[in-house]
């Protein structure tokens, strides 16, 4: 038995008048109910404790015959229970077209709202029952009325449920294509944490619901009716950003083809290009990567965006929410203010994205607010195990790093450039992770084997775990004696650290 719209008070021991008929239908004693109706021995409108009438219970049970008998006996098709539910809203919830038609023919109000302002049309809109929606609309259901809690219309409900055909029916009956839901104006709380404060949620459009769900048919239906493809929510998230963020790359491609702004960023400064690069190598919270089912891949979106004029040098405006953890605690300090798509790609040793970005004018060593550059990041510098989730131990990581470094160096990246708060060089990062192949590759290209960071540490110190900690499961994983011996054999020496008044703040590691 469905109970979404019927109050849980039905089991209460109190009764409002003679509710024998309602009790019989609710408890499944159908024969007894039919007998009471036939003999007129019970009031067909007598409700039980929560105001639920026999007709509402019959609609809830999908009992077409009982619904017809009750109406012929004088049941009120518009009588509500304490939650504002009517027989019509219950039939809509059950997606029962026949009962919807019977009730409407008997005078049921197609616009009767529940306690939260939700109408039968909104309820039907979440289903695939276009026929029931058409019955309601033909009887005068208001297609643009909003429910009270979130200010959402039937079109938004349909979009959030990926009901393309339903949306087309609603749009054909005049649904406002760009209507916005309410904005949740919560009282802001002062936070001492160094992280961005989100904008008030809400102001969602049917387009934003559709792109969030990845419903191509829904998006196409809206575009055909003239929906604005760049209308954002209060956080600046546009339909294109929403589609990419939620891994709906076919939808993203369609929006780009329809003229979506490829350079519009959100509250945090994330452009569509940044998010596409981000998703191309995004680990999902320690679990295996979950590839999209779309034909279009993230790297395809990167290419399409660049071909459409996306600016590869747009920088983040603030530290964005961290996608791979349950809460934004600003874990990854490298991908912060000033980070470019190229730096994001370099951090992941994503040679394919790096090549595309460089070919389209990315500035090779544009630093972020921490002074970190793509060339230094590509060698593993600036990251710790906490924000790579084991990614830096993949079997092909060193080959990826070498390919990425070669691209960056060929476009002007500095082999001995020092970056970040600790002024680290590419060789420091490779030594820190114990990447022997990368160390040898950098040295063969002429990397300064004894270059020191701002504290006086050399690559030998990084390899031996003296220049910063890294641990997993409480065990240190930052001592790579083989790497240290390799560097020493080639002339490397340990540095003489300068006196530090305090260790620089931020994650441990390079």
Give short role names for the model-derived ranges.
Residues 17-57:
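N-terminal segments that cap or nucleate solenoid repeat domains
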Residues 8-16:
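Hydrophobic h-region of N-terminal signal peptides that target proteins for export
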Residues 23-27, 57-63, 90-96, 123-129, ...:
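Ankyrin repeat A-helix N-terminal signature
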Residues 30-37, 63-71, 96-104, 129-137, ...:
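Ankyrin repeat structural motif
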Residues 452-501:
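Leucine-rich solenoid repeat scaffolds
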Residues 48, 81, 114, 147-148, ...:
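Ankyrin repeat boundary/linker residues
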Residues 51, 84, 117, 150-151, ...:
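Start-of-repeat signature of ankyrin repeats
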């Amino acid at each position: 038995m469905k109970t979404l719209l019927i109050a849980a008070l039905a089991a209460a021991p109190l009764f409002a008048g003679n509710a024998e008929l309602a009790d019989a239908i609710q408890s499944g004693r159908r024969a007894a109910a039919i007998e009471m109706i036939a003999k007129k021995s019970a009031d067909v409108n007598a409700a039980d404790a929560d105001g639920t009438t026999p007709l509402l219970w019959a609609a809830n049970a999908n009992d077409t015959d009982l619904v017809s008998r009750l109406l012929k006996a004088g049941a009120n098709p518009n009588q509500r229970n304490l939650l504002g539910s009517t027989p019509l809203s219950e039939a809509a919830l059950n997606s029962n077209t026949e009962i919807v038609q019977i009730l409407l023919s008997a005078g049921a109000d197609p616009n009767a709202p529940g306690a939260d302002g939700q109408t039968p049309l909104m309820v039907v809109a979440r289903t695939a029952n276009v026929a029931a929606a058409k019955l309601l609309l033909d009887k005068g259901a208001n297609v643009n009325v909003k429910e009270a809690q979130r200010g959402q219309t039937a079109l938004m409900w349909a979009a959030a449920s990926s009901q393309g055909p339903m949306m087309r029916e609603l749009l054909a009956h005049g649904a406002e294509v760009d209507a916005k839901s309410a904005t949740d104006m919560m009282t802001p709380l002062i936070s001492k944490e160094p992280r961005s404060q989100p904008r008030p949620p809400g102001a969602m459009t049917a387009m934003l619901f559709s792109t969030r769900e990845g419903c191509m048919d829904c998006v196409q239906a809206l575009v055909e009716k003239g929906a604005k493809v760049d209308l954002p929510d209060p956080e600046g998230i546009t339909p294109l950003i929403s589609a990419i963020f939620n891994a709906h790359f076919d939808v993203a491609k369609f929006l780009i083809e329809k003229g979506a702004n490829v350079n519009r960023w959100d509250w945090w400064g994330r452009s569509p290009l940044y998010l596409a690069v981000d998703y191309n190598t995004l680990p999902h919270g320690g679990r295996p990567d979950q590839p999209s089912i779309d034909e279009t891949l993230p790297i395809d979106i990167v290419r399409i965006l660049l071909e459409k004029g996306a600016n590869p040098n747009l920088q983040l405006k603030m530290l964005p929410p961290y996608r791979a953890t349950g809460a934004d605690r600003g874990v990854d300090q490298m991908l912060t203010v000033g980070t470019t798509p190229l730096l994001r790609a370099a951090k992941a040793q994503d040679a394919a994205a790096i090549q595309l970005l460089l070919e389209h004018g990315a500035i090779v060593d544009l630093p972020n607010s921490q002074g970190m550059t793509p060339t230094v990041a590509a060698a593993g510098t600036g990251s710790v195990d906490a924000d790579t989730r084991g990614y830096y131990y993949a079997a092909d990581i060193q080959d990826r790093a070498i390919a990425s470094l070669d691209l960056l160096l060929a476009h002007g990246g500095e082999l001995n450039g020092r970056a970040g708060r600790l002024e680290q060089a590419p060789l420091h990062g490779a030594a820190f992770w114990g990447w022997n192949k990368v160390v040898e590759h950098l040295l063969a290209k002429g990397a300064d084997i004894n270059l020191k960071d701002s504290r006086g540490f050399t690559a030998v110190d990084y390899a031996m775990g003296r220049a910063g900690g890294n641990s997993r499961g409480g065990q240190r994983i930052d001592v790579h004696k083989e790497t240290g011996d390799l560097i020493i054999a080639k002339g490397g020496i340990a540095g003489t650290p300068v006196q530090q008044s305090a260790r620089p703040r931020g994650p441990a590691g390079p």
